[in-house]
Structure formats: C-alpha cells, structure tokens
Amino acid sequence: MQLSTQVLERNAQQFSEYKNLLIMNPPENDDLDFLTPEKVLTLDYRVYLSHKNELEELIEFSLSHAPSTLYDGAVVVLPKSKGELDLMLAYIAPMLEVGADIYLVGEKKGGIASASKRLENYGSNSSKLDSAKHCQLWQVSLEEKAKAFDLDSWIKIIDISFNNIDMKVAAIPGVFSFAELDQGTALLMENMFTKLEGRILDFGCGCGVLGAYTKKLNPEIQLEMVDINLLALICAQKTVELSGIEAKIYPSDGWDDVQGRVNGVVTNPPFHRGIGTEYQTTEYFIQKAKDKMARYAPLLLVANTFLKYAAIIEKTFGRCDVLAETTKFRVYKAFR
C-alpha cells in the first residue's frame, strides 16, 4: 500500500460522512474500499486496469466525466507535476457542489507542501489535517461554483521545425517534453530511418512529435502510437491532426493492447512514473518485442546513457548497435 493511501486510511472516519465522494488520480492497485467512493477518475491507463475488476463502472479513464449529481467531497492524490495538478483540480471542481470538501494528499518529497497552495484557488480556508508517513493531507471547502472545464484552454500548440520538416505539436502540462523538443527525441529524429514500411509503432508516444516526424519522413507507413497517459494520447491525436497525417492512437500498457506484429518500433521510452523512476515497463517491452515484431523489423530506441538497455536489447535481438550518441543520450538500433 502506497504511503498516501496509508494516510487516507488512517483518516478513514473523515471520509465516512460523504454521500457522494469523488476520487481523482488513485494509486495503482491499492484497495479503496475504505473510502466508499461514488466515482473514481484516472488519467493513467495502467491504474485504470489495476482497479477495473474491483471497481467496475465506478472507475473511468476519461477527461469527459459528467456526473448526474454533484459530489459533496473529492480526494485528489498528488500527481507528479504541479501543472497536471492544476488541470485535475480544474477538471473536478465543476463536478462539486458549493461547500464540498476537496482533499489533497501526497508525499513530502513530491512537493505536497507547495502543491497545497493550489487549493487556495478554490477556497480561503485550506488547512493541513494530517502529517504522517512522510505525507501530508490537506483540505479546503469549495466557496463558489467553479467554471466549466475547457480542455482546449490547457492545450499549447508549439511550432517545431526539424530538418526542414515543419510540425505543429500539441502539449498539455504533465505530458513528457511539454513546451519544447527534448534532446533525446531530437537525437533519434536526427537519425531516423527513411525507408520504414508497414506498421510502425511509437511506444510511449508522449505529445506525438516522434511519431509525427517518423510519418512525415515515411509517409507510406501505418503509424500507431501508444501511451498509458490519457493527456499524452490527447496531445498525440491533436498533433497528428495539426500535422495533416493519419495515425492510430490508443492506450496500451506496453504491448498488451497492440494486436498482431508490427514492422518497426520507434521510441523514447519513459522511465519516470509519478515522482520516482521505473525501468521495468521498458525492459519488459524490449524483452517482449521479438514476439510482437515481424521478421527484419527495426527497433530504434533512444535513452539516457546511464540506462542499461543495451544488454537487454542484445540479449533479445542477438545484437545491439549504437546509431548515435551524445554525453547524455544514446540511440540504439536492432533488427528482429
């Protein structure tokens, strides 16, 4: 059980008074029965899957939830970025009745103390209710009806020109490479193959810039883009539309929802999850790749130089070459 869940559980009596309690951004796998929620919302596909069997229709992987009855309380678990927290609060606030309590819980190392100040946008009486397990629990009462949530107002459009290819890229707070092209992705784009064909998968697509660039260089490919972050999928869809290309964009935890075999993979895979690091997803993705890729299909992967993916790629594919590198990043190439 995660620390934030432990703090919520030790304050379970506090939440027993609510008839319609909303949970936003629950931890993965942790049992939420003690909160008796009316609805649980997540922007993380893996979290959604971890609770789906237990919560069934109570949980939604969505940014379009419209409740039939306003909620009288909400619990928000602190996300990684403050921008994502702002979006989450703006998303749920219109679902709450005036006077409803908003709770924010998170770890101190995740910045809960400074993040709690975001609650002041919804009420002037925010207070710290608990401090334990290296976490804090804050509460505020909604003082006035919140304005309707407008997703488009959170999307920033960035013009990117790379190797004489112009693209418009959509970005939302909380999505990797928000507001600028990161150096790792740029290094992979600089060394992108120009003779790709068939189904090409962009794993951990983020805002969609890598996939869009790959499609621009290889217009005949059938591009597919996957991520577990709903905000990333929304950005990728917008990026594709603005770039005038076509792609199939859908949530998938690694290979789980990718049907059949693909003819190539391009990826700047994630290794952060929440406020920590998590390497297992990418390691498992590489290990499983041989079973999901067609014969002779290329894998092009960029990663920080300190990440030990080369040995896993070599063990899986029999060979791993370094296509390009800087002091911070390395592009690996392998063939099925």
Name these PLM-found stretches:
Residues M1-E56, Q183-T267:
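Conserved SAM/SAH cofactor-binding pocket of Class I
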Residues E60-S62, L129, A170, E224, ...:
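General small-molecule cofactor/ligand-binding pocket signal
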Residues G73-G83, F203-G211, V262-G276:
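Conserved proline-anchored active-site loop of SAM-dependent methyltransferases
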Residues L89, D101-S124, K128-S131, C207, ...:
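Conserved Class I SAM-dependent methyltransferase catalytic core
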Residues S62-T69, D256-G260:
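Short amphipathic alpha-helix with an adjacent loop that forms part of the alpha/beta core around
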Residues K133-R199:
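SAM-dependent Rossmann-like transferase core, predominantly class I methyltransferases
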